[in-house]
Amino acid sequence: MIHFVLLVSRQGKVRLTKWYSPYTQKERSKVIRELSGVILNRGPKLCNFIEWRGYKVVYKRYASLYFCMCIDEADNELEVLEIIHHYVEILDRYFGSVCELDLIFNFHKAYYILDELLIAGELQESSKKTVARIISAQDQLVEVAKEEASSISNIIAQATK
């Protein structure tokens, strides 16, 4: 089971967090501070797996971001590396070569994509095409809702004149 997902920049700024196990806000802050310090200070040639507090942390650096997932000791690290890579590929497909700014300004989309991929700390959807289709449908729903809200606003504005 994946306990949490962290995306941290090389500067140590947290760009995305998703928690699948209960942690208090104080514990979350401590975990983020501790893990970002450990991961950012590791050399690029070192292993992408860390044993930490009875768990394993699997991380991978893509451009200026570190994608980290904390898993149970018995879980397969290589499978989690593939899940990270799968998430990055879906982000790349959606944003067209994803970068840190895409995640900053469109964080809600990054969370939505992650929610389509993982549920309760387990891989839900392995098909990139299915995830892309679902995200596209959600984008269309948002556009329709914006158009309806705009037309309702126009009707109200004309009625109050």
From Swiss-Prot:
One of its GO terms (cellular component) is AP-1 adaptor complex. It comes from the Eukaryota. Its main location: Golgi. The keyword Transport applies. SUPFAM superfamilies: SNARE-like. It is a peripheral membrane protein. Expressed in seedlings, roots, stems, leaves, flowers and siliques (developing fruits and seeds). PROSITE patterns: CLAT_ADAPTOR_S. Keywords: Cytoplasmic vesicle, Golgi apparatus, Membrane, Protein transport, Transport. Gene3D superfamilies: 3.30.450.60. One of its GO terms (molecular function) is clathrin adaptor activity. Disulfide bonds: none annotated. The keyword Transport applies. It is found in: Golgi apparatus; Cytoplasmic vesicle, Clathrin-coated vesicle membrane. One of its GO terms (biological process) is intracellular protein transport. InterPro entries: AP1_sigma, AP_complex_ssu, AP_mu_sigma_su, Clathrin_sm-chain_CS, Longin-like_dom_sf. Belongs to the adaptor complexes small subunit family. Adaptor protein complex 1 (AP-1) is a heterotetramer composed of two large adaptins (gamma-type subunit and beta-type subunit), a medium adaptin (mu-type subunit) and a small adaptin (sigma-type subunit). Subunit of clathrin-associated adaptor protein complex 1 that plays a role in protein sorting at the trans-Golgi network and early endosomes (TGN/EE). The AP complexes mediate the recruitment of clathrin to membranes and the recognition of sorting signals within the cytosolic tails of transmembrane cargo molecules. This is AP-1 complex subunit sigma-1.
